[in-house]
Regions:
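Short, contiguous, pocket-lining structural segments
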Residues: 121-124, 145
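Mobile "lid/hinge" segments at catalytic clefts and subdomain interfaces of large enzymes
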Residues: 1-12, 19, 35-37, 57-121, ...
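Glycine-/charge-enriched secondary-structure boundary and capping motifs
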Residues: 19-33, 37, 42, 46-59, ...
Length: 250
């Protein structure tokens, strides 16, 4: 259960009107979100004049949250638990790619607006996820954030050594938008078959959009039956860079 947030707001030269405008809009956005979500700001820090060679950094507000687990027996994490469980995506996917990791890292596109935030859906989806966790109905949960759906699924597989089989959505969107878009207020949940009906009932009663996107399986990270990787290969790729980085810097 979220209790409060803190922040560190990192910006360039505030003597530049554009930079000061970014800072002011950031504060306004935080204010609106915190008031709606009932998250008090208990502390914070501001850092200006950040840049290199007279070039300002991108506006970088960093938010840290603190929460309370009232019953640790009902807590969960983002590791898949069992082969054959259903995987459900909570929240609507619109395929927003601007300001995404995919656009910046793979396409070198850095402009464009961030994804729209619907505070009503954000609050409702988050509170419903919390309710399902408290009722011990979810095997695992992961928010969809940096990197989009595909990265969150990969993290869950790598952490647990359990694969996935992802099916085609009923309304197939652009594959890059679907898997790499960073639309807000979304969660991946893993559910035992015998708990699915009750989970579905609560989601419908709470007016939460959801779609079944696949199942957990042994060994392979599989998309539509067309693209397939061994989970241990993904693990090796995920850990290899750090070993090579250490070797190069030591």
């Amino acid at each position: 259960k979220p209790l409060a947030i803190t922040n560190c707001l990192n910006f360039g030269n505030p003597e530049n009107e554009e930079i000061m405008g970014e800072f002011a809009e950031t504060i306004q956005g935080m204010k609106e979100a915190c008031e709606y979500l009932d998250f008090p700001v208990v502390s914070g820090n501001v850092s200006f004049y950040n840049g290199t060679n007279k070039k300002n950094i991108f506006p970088t507000p960093v938010i840290g949250g603190i929460g309370l687990i009232e019953n640790v027996k009902c807590s969960t994490n983002n590791n898949f638990k069992k082969i054959g469980n259903r995987i459900i995506l909570i929240g609507k996917t619109f395929g927003h790619l601007y300001q995404s990791a995919f656009f910046s890292e793979c396409c070198e596109i850095y402009d464009g607006p961030p994804p729209e935030v619907n505070l009503k859906n954000e609050k409702n989806n988050g509170e419903t996820i919390l309710k399902l966790i408290e009722k011990d109905l979810l095997s695992s949960v992961h928010d969809v954030s940096s990197g989009g759906l595909i990265m969150s699924l990969a993290e869950m597989s790598i952490n647990s050594s359990i694969g996935v089989h992802i099916i085609k959505p009923k309304k197939l969107k652009n594959i890059f938008e679907y898997f790499f878009g960073e639309d807000q207020g979304r969660y991946i949940v893993e559910i035992d078959d015998d708990k699915f009906d009750l989970v579905e009932k609560i989601l419908k009663e709470s007016n939460v959009f959801y779609e079944i996107i696949g199942k957990t399986q042994k060994d392979f990270f599989e998309i539509y039956g067309e693209t397939k990787f061994k989970v241990n290969e993904l693990y090796n790729i995920n850990t290899k860079w750090y070993k090579e980085y250490n070797a190069a810097t030591n």
